[in-house]
From Swiss-Prot:
PANTHER family from the UniProt entry: LEUCYL/PHENYLALANYL-TRNA--PROTEIN TRANSFERASE, LEUCYL_PHENYLALANYL-TRNA--PROTEIN TRANSFERASE
Organism expressing this protein natively: Rhizobium etli (strain ATCC 51251 / DSM 11541 / JCM 21823 / NBRC 15573 / CFN 42)
Disulfide-bond pairs as recorded: none
Xref: SUPFAM superfamilies: Acyl-CoA N-acyltransferases (Nat)
Family: Belongs to the L/F-transferase family.
EC number: 2.3.2.6
Positions of transmembrane segments: none
Protein name in UniProt: Leucyl/phenylalanyl-tRNA--protein transferase
Name of encoding gene: aat
Claim: Acyltransferase is one of the keywords in the record: yes
């Protein structure tokens, strides 16, 4: 990963979108640190939309529709859940600066959620940023078995349907690799990003 570059809390939503367009994304050291820094990995996580695959057991569970899937229904609740410290995630990079910035992106149509609901309870979800024909996945959470996985399946279906060309996962994890995520060298990623940025901003 390239060295972090410190940025003041005075960052604006416009600057944030510009950063995405040139391959940068923000993180914070912790939820209590008001500053953010820019990250530009040497290897970028990408989930090819034409090579997305799921296990037979997950496909069967998706068909059973265990949750109601909603898009862009409750952004604040989703990002708050993603920022929660849990036993499996004792710290978070989502600070208040990031939460405020992405709430504004949501208001202007550049941040989106996929949400899994069980009745009136939010049990899983993810959020990310859309720009051109790219979707930049930011974070996800799950309070029920497979809830975030099912949200990811619906995200990919949505992106394919709308004509998106790039699903950026920032980094790869063993979990994401089971869906087909790959590490893409920075130079190759720049080419994929350039194509996506040449596209008009697609409606999510």
């Amino acid at each position: 990963m390239a060295g972090p570059r410190r940025k003041s809390p005075g960052i604006t939503p416009d600057i944030l979108l510009r950063a995405y367009s040139i391959g940068l994304f923000p993180m914070a050291e912790s939820a209590d640190d008001p500053e953010i820094f820019w990250v530009e990995p040497e290897l970028r996580g990408v989930l090819p939309l034409d090579n997305f695959h799921i296990s037979k057991s997950l496909a069967k569970r998706v068909r059973r529709r265990p949750f109601e899937i909603r898009f862009d229904h409750d952004f604040e609740q989703v990002i708050a859940a993603c920022a929660e410290e849990t036993s499996g995630r004792p710290s978070t990079w989502i600070n208040q600066t990031i939460r405020s910035l992405y709430a504004t992106l949501f208001e202007i149509g550049h941040a989106h959620t996929v949400e899994a609901w069980d009745g009136d309870e939010l049990v899983g979800g993810l959020y990310g940023v859309s720009l051109g024909s790219a979707f930049f996945g930011e974070s996800m959470f799950s309070r029920r078995t497979d809830a975030s996985k099912i949200c990811l399946v619906h995200l990919v279906e949505r992106l394919r349907e709308k004509g998106f060309t790039l699903l950026d996962t920032q980094f790869t994890t063993e979990h994401l690799k089971t869906f087909g995520a790959i590490d893409v060298p920075k130079a190759e990623y720049a080419l994929l990003l350039a194509v996506a940025m040449e596209s008009p901003h697609l409606k999510f």
